[in-house]
Amino acid sequence: MLRVENLHVRRGGKDVLAGIDLQLLPGEVLGVLGPNGAGKSSLLGGLSGELAAHQGQVLLDDQELAHWSGAERAQRLAVLPQASSLDFAFRVEEVVALGRLPHQTGRVRDEEIVNAALNAADVAHLSGRSYLALSGGERQRVHLARVLAQLWPGQPGHNLLLDEPTSALDPLHQHVTLQAIRAFADRGAAVLVILHDLNLAARYCDRVLLLEGGRPHSLGTPTAVLRPEPLKAVFGLEVLVQEHPERGHPLIIAR
């Protein structure tokens, strides 16, 4: 289990994140929302250990994250950053197979997992193609498959951190991606996903953290958090919130 206590992160001598207390729960998708500059990517950086905590601590299975070896950490924690740079002409399946490097499961099992992750991210049809020949959205889905393969099939004790995994995707693949993430959590993994689309968060997330100015504004179920008052306070946006006629989750409509 991944949790943070009173997390503060500094950049350039100023706090970009302050007062964060958070626990990722097995089987849960936690969505992180907020305007640009709210601290969403800084939160992911602090949780993953990429950014050092100026104050507070990050704990993985009740042990400070910094005390884990790289390989042991990678077997429990996978991170998909906002931008994943790769300048080599690897085939798609080779990129996804990079997620298996921390493991010692053997070639046959690794190939099975890579194929399963390719299918989950809807990129199996791209196998054999050069990564460099792909569109931005295709590359994003290949990297999703890579981090899924790293923790496949997802189970309690696994933690997946995703920074805007739908940003380059068309509407269909936004849902395909979040359905894959939802299925991963349903098998027991804890997932944190940064999103900008309020309605995607309402549909796929169990809890939502609303950030404002690097601090937590609201944390709770989508029904509790995605209300007109908090959304006006954080985004400056006037909205109507209705119940989805078929699924029952909040449906947010800009006025």
From Swiss-Prot:
**Membrane topology per the record?**
Peripheral membrane protein
Q: Does the keyword Disulfide bond apply?
A: no
Residues holding ATP: G34, P35, N36, G37, A38, G39, K40, S41
Q: Which InterPro entries match?
A: AAA+_ATPase, ABC_transporter-like_ATP-bd, P-loop_NTPase
Which superkingdom does the taxonomy of this entry point to?
Bacteria
Tagged with keyword Hydrolase: no
According to the UniProt entry, what is the EC number of this protein? 7.6.2.-
Q: Which GO terms describe its cellular component?
A: plasma membrane
The top EC class, named as a word, is translocase
Q: Which UniProt keywords apply?
A: ATP-binding, Cell inner membrane, Cell membrane, Membrane, Nucleotide-binding, Translocase, Transport
Subunit structure, as described in the record: The complex is composed of two ATP-binding proteins (HmuV), two transmembrane proteins (HmuU) and a solute-binding protein (HmuT).
Q: Sum up the protein's function in the record's words.
A: Part of the ABC transporter complex HmuTUV involved in hemin import. Responsible for energy coupling to the transport system.
- The protein depicted here goes by the name Hemin import ATP-binding protein HmuV
Q: What gene is this protein translated from?
A: hmuV
